[in-house]
Design a protein with these regions (language model features):
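Aromatic/hydrophobic pocket-lining residues that form π-stacking "cages" and hydrophobic walls in ligand
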Residues: 100, 161, 330
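A structural signal for small-residue-enriched, beta-sheet-centric alpha/beta enzyme cores
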Residues: 180-186
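Non-transmembrane, aqueous-exposed alpha-helical and coiled segments at domain scale
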Residues: 159-166
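Conserved small/polar residues in nucleotide/adenosyl-binding loops
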Residues: 327-337
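Short gly/pro-enriched beta-turn/loop segments at secondary-structure junctions
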Residues: 135-138, 167-171, 176-178, 268
Length: 337
């Protein structure tokens, strides 16, 4: 059996517009065309496994992995139900799901498989598999995004997945179903009026895409907390998919990236990005965080705050030097409070 590997990675948007209404907005059509191009790339690579990390499947009790060999249902989006419904019938690799579950627990993670009739597949996974694997030719696996998982836990989740990919000799494609900026309009808008929610969101999105196109995936992961504070709705789920995707690619900055499309979906930043593991040979890296192999502790209530916070700048007193004595400005002190 050949050594398994991740042959490609993709970032894809989560909302149903690209499936149900691509022609209502030129930007949605561009995203749909980018999905189609990504699907062709996956087919050309002869991948034999699609791995979906979806931000629209939140979990609290550990990491959940879809293990129903053929989940069938009809998905209606909670917000955009007016667009219609998406029937689905997916080809899930249950053997890989169970092996990943075992590997998670071997590395200290809380993990379980899900397999019962009627369990709803989230919108991000439905959109990704419907458009990237339209004929169900390639088996897939879907993992939840644990709401409280910090960088350490998310990195270990990826490494346990890599354990199974290598053990089974798979040609895998890693896919994060996510938005860039996720601030959305809170009222109805006409499709023709869709745009990124704010200029600030757009500027940050473009900087993220610049890094990804340069193959600097780990740099994006290292900036995850800053990105979350700047352009993400402040909730428990952080900008953690980049932690997972970077770890799936060996925490590298010398990848080959290509942005296939970037457009707004009801104000959120939607992008289709292809990340090729081929090295550009120019990616320097200066990491601020440790590499981890095992998860050794439970999530605490302070973890989320720790993940959001950056160290405060230290105040350094001026160096002593041969100079004049300090001057007391008494006329200014009178105004101090």
């Amino acid at each position: 059996m050949s050594q398994g590997e991740v042959v490609a990675s993709f970032v894809v948007p989560v909302h149903p517009h690209t499936v149900l209404a691509p022609d209502q907005n030129p930007g949605w059509r561009k995203l749909r065309d980018a999905f189609d191009e990504a699907a062709q790339t996956i087919q050309d690579l002869e991948a034999d496994l699609l791995i979906i990390y979806s931000t629209t499947w939140p979990s609290i009790i550990g990491h959940q992995i879809q293990a129903d060999p053929n989940p069938e249902w009809v998905m209606v989006d909670h917000d955009f139900h007016d667009l219609g419904s998406i029937p689905y019938s997916f080809n899930i690799d249950a053997d890989f799901a169970h092996a990943w579950d075992d590997a998670n627990r071997n590395r200290g993670l809380q993990s379980r498989c899900v397999n019962y009739k009627g369990f709803p597949i989230d919108v991000g996974s439905v959109v990704a598999l419907t458009l990237l694997n339209p004929d169900n030719r390639i088996p897939a696996v879907i993992v939840s995004s644990n709401m409280y998982a910090n960088r350490t836990e998310t990195t270990v989740l990826a490494k346990s997945c890599l354990d199974v990919i290598q053990a089974q000799g798979r040609k895998a494609v890693a896919i994060t179903a996510m938005s860039l900026s996720n601030r959305m309009f809170t009222d109805f808008i006409e499709a023709k009026d869709d745009k990124i929610h704010s200029l600030k969101d757009d500027e940050w999105n473009r900087k993220i895409l610049e890094f990804l196109e340069q193959g600097r995936l780990e740099d994006v992961g290292q900036l995850s907390r800053t990105i979350h504070r700047q352009i993400r709705v402040q909730k428990v789920v952080a900008f953690k998919p980049m932690w997972w995707l970077s770890a799936m690619n060996g925490n590298r900055n010398d990848l080959t990236g290509r942005v296939l499309a970037y457009e707004a979906i009801h104000g959120a930043g939607g992008a289709v990005v292809h990340i090729d593991p081929t090295s550009t040979g120019i990616g320097d890296k200066e990491y601020d965080e440790d590499d981890v192999e095992y998860f050794h502790g439970e999530r605490g209530v302070l973890d989320a705050d720790d993940e959001q916070a950056e160290p405060a700048p230290q105040s350094t007193p001026p160096a002593e030097a041969n100079g004049p004595e300090p001057v007391s400005y008494t006329h200014l002190r009178a105004h101090e409070t």
